[in-house]
Design a protein with these regions (language model features):
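His/Asp/Glu-enriched, well-ordered alpha-helical/loop segment
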Residues: 5-85, 101-104
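Short, solvent-exposed cationic patches
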Residues: 133-147
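Short, positively charged
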Residues: 48-50, 85-92, 145-147
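C-terminal cap of metal-dependent C-N hydrolases
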Residues: 76-133
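Generic structural signal for well-ordered, non-membrane alpha-helical segments
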Residues: 23, 48, 52, 125, ...
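Residue-level recognition of short, well-ordered coil/turn positions
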Residues: 8-9, 116, 147
């Protein structure tokens, strides 16, 4: 047995919605991957930075993309920002990256996709969220009930 990072296999993390990990949380998926490695191989098996790297650069590598996965000139500008000034992060800011992974934020403060701001101050800027949620829940009910 060996830790995933030592296996030589390209590893990427991702979610495609609430049906895939019961929460649609990419950071939750990063945390889960880290914890599973630590359970199997000890507390030093993976750091928060390594787990986040699987979700960013690792995801790009798995997709054979060299234009995503990092913030650098010439790369697609996709990133999120979290406000660490909340009670959930109290006492954890000596390592903000680990705080982000272990404290599992419940919402994104800012999200930029392909250079376009889609979440600002925690609110979607691109859609009418109540309308989308109503439609989503209607479709979900129909799917479950067989309507």
């Amino acid at each position: 047995e060996m830790c995933i990072r030592d296996s030589g296999v390209s590893v990427g993390l991702g979610v495609d919605g609430s049906a895939s990990n019961d929460g649609a949380s990419m950071i939750g998926e990063v945390r889960q991957a880290l914890l599973l490695q630590r359970v199997g191989f000890g507390p030093d098996a993976m750091s928060a930075r390594e787990a986040l790297e699987f979700a960013t650069l690792g995801g790009a590598k798995v997709l054979n993309r060299n234009d995503i996965g990092a913030l650098a000139p010439g790369m697609v500008a996709d990133f999120v920002a979290f406000d660490l000034g909340h009670l959930a992060y109290a006492g954890a800011l000596h390592d903000p990256l680990a705080a982000l992974v272990f404290c599992t934020p419940t919402h994104v403060d800012t999200s930029v996709i392909n250079g376009r701001v889609v979440v600002k101050d925690g609110h979607l800027t691109t859609v009418d969220l109540p309308l989308v949620l109503e439609r989503h829940n209607t479709l979900a009910r129909q799917l479950v009930s067989g309507e």
